Amino acid sequence: MARNIGAVCRRCRRENLKLFLKGDRCYSDKCSFERRAFAPGQHGQARFKKVSDYAVQLREKQKVKSMYGVLEAQFRLTFEKAEAQKGVAGENLLILLERRLDNAVFRAGFASSRTQARQIVRHKHILINGKRVDIPSYQVSEGDVISLREKSRANAGVVDNLEAVVRRGVPTWLELDKDNFKASVKALPNREEITMPIQERLIVELYSKN
């Protein structure tokens, strides 16, 4: 299975934005971005000439891909689904990304990062409405109940993650029941709740050129 194996902290520095890809480390003084908030490489601190519109659009797409941990083929497919839906294509794209099961597992607090959430899903620790689902890209729907398998609930890492979720908060479209290791999808996510600085129109403009 294809995956991105590049250095995680370099991605944040490349985007000049903390993407919270390494869980608890991102909230500590060990965060590489906090210590070196400039682009990676020998000339990372140098001044660059003005970039083209295409480069800006491409960078925005790469940022969102890194944030959600999605590779190009799947990202493009998600965009095509967003474009086919009613409404604004860019907003639809972000909502589809938010509805991914690995993202919902992360948002609910079962994992400290989306990378860890993908591992939890793939290793068959997650149930949807009582049935095991091991597909990270699975789209959660309103009314779904996401829960941790009984055998997985003793995992100290998961317990720590649920305690730490208070630091970043749980979005209003999810309702967390920490005691029972469950999260209910109260509603579909909306654009206003995605607080990371994303200019989705740039992604739409980029794909419209192809």
UniProtKB/Swiss-Prot annotation:
GO terms for cellular component: small ribosomal subunit. PROSITE patterns: RIBOSOMAL_S4, S4. Residues 99-170 form the S4 RNA-binding domain. One of its GO terms (molecular function) is rRNA binding. Coiled coil: none annotated. The keyword Ribosomal protein applies. InterPro entries: Ribosomal_uS4, Ribosomal_uS4_bac-type, Ribosomal_uS4_CS, Ribosomal_uS4_N, S4_RNA-bd, S4_RNA-bd_sf. It comes from the Bacteria. Keywords: Ribonucleoprotein, Ribosomal protein, RNA-binding, rRNA-binding. Pfam families: Ribosomal_S4, S4. One of its GO terms (biological process) is translation. Belongs to the universal ribosomal protein uS4 family. Part of the 30S ribosomal subunit. Contacts protein S5. The interaction surface between S4 and S5 is involved in control of translational fidelity. One of the primary rRNA binding proteins, it binds directly to 16S rRNA where it nucleates assembly of the body of the 30S subunit. This is Small ribosomal subunit protein uS4. It comes from Desulfotalea psychrophila (strain LSv54 / DSM 12343). The gene is rpsD.
